Amino acid sequence: MQVTAPRTLLLLLSAALALTETWAGSHSMRYFHTAMSRPGRGEPRFITVGYVDDTQFVWFDSDAASPRKEPRTPWIEQEGPEYWDRETQISKTNTQTYRVGLGTLRGYYNQSEDGSHTIQRMYGCDMGPDGRLLRGYSQLAYDGKDYLALNEDLSSWTAADTAAQITQRKWEAARAAEQERAYLEGLCVEWLRRYLENGKETLQRADPPKTHVTHHPISDHEATLRCWALGFYPAEITLTWQRDGEDQTQDTELVETRPAGDRTFQKWAAVVVPSGEEQRYTCRVQHEGLPEPLTLRWEPSSQSTIPIVGIVAGLAVLVVTVAVVAVVAAVMCRRKSSGGKGGSYSQAASSDSAQGSDVSLTA
C-alpha cells in the first residue's frame, strides 16, 4: 500500500508559529490512493482518502455523479473554494494517471485484459510534539503486493522484486527520493500543523479513559483479571499488568485499540492469576488525558460487569471501518500478481496541492 504526501504551499503558517507551537503527543497525516480496473464495467475507479490521525477528513471518488474532493469532517470545511477547486483538479488528474498506469502495468506483467487489477499508494508523515517530522512514508503496491517503498532514511528505495528494481533505477535517476523528502519534511508537516490548529477542538483533545477491573473465574484454581479502558482519545494508550510491582508483559493478553462509535476508543488487557492471589496484581494505565498514570486493583466488593453494549457498539464501528478500508485498500488482497516484469514509473512534477505530487506511470 502506498501513501504520497501533500505538497500545497501554506501561506497562513508563519515560521515563528512553526517553531514555537507545540502539540501534545504525536500526530499523523496519511493519504490513500486506490485505482481498480473492472473490465466490461467502465473505466477504472479511483478513490482518494485523507486522514489526520484517526479522522477521515477528505474523500474523492471518480464514480460520483459529479466527482469532487469532498470534506468528511467539519473543521476542513473552513478551507475556501480555491482549496477545493485545486484539490478536485489534482484528484481528477490523478484519476487519469492511475488509469493509464493500470494499463501499463498490465502489459508489463503480461496480464490479460479480462482480469481486474489494482494500484495503491500510501503516503504521509508523522509529526512529534515539537512540530517536526518523526517519520515519512511513501509506498506503492500492485495487485496486493508490495512494489516499491521509500526507506526510513527518506533517501533510498526498497524494491520488492526485479520488476520493481526497474522502477527503482528510474526513480533514482529522476532523484525522486529528494522530492519526496522535501515534501515530507516540509509541506506535509506544515499542512498537518494547519489541520491540527483548525481542528484542535477534536484533534487535540485528550479525553481520559474510564477504567475498571473485572474478575472472571476459570476454575477453582484460576481466574482472569481484565483491565478496561473506555471512552478515551486519542487512541494511544498503555495498559500494563504487574505482579508485586513486576511487569507481566509475557503473560498478558492485550487486544488492539478499538473505536467505540462516539469518536473515542476502547481497550482491555487480561491476565490469568491463581485464585486467591488477585490482590497481588495491579493494572497500570498511561494516557495523555491522565495527569499521572493510574494503578488499579480488582475490588471484590464492587465486581464490575462487562460493558457488553459498549463493546458490541465498538465492534460494529470496527466492522464499518473495515468495510470502508476494504473499498479503499483491501482490494489489494482480492488478487495476487501473476508474475512477470514490473511496471516502469517516473516521478511526477511537484504540485502545490495539499495532496502533494503523485506517481506517474509511463510505458
From Swiss-Prot:
CDD domains reported for this sequence: IgC1_MHC_Ia_HLA-B (cd21026)
Ig-like C1-type domain residues: 209-297
Membrane topology qualifier: Single-pass type I membrane protein
Pfam families associated with the record: C1-set (PF07654), MHC_I (PF00129), MHC_I_C (PF06623)
Topology, Cytoplasmic side: 334-363
Region (Alpha-1): 25-114
Its biological purpose: Involved in the presentation of foreign antigens to the immune system.
Name the UniProt record assigns to this protein: Class I histocompatibility antigen, Gogo-B*0201 alpha chain
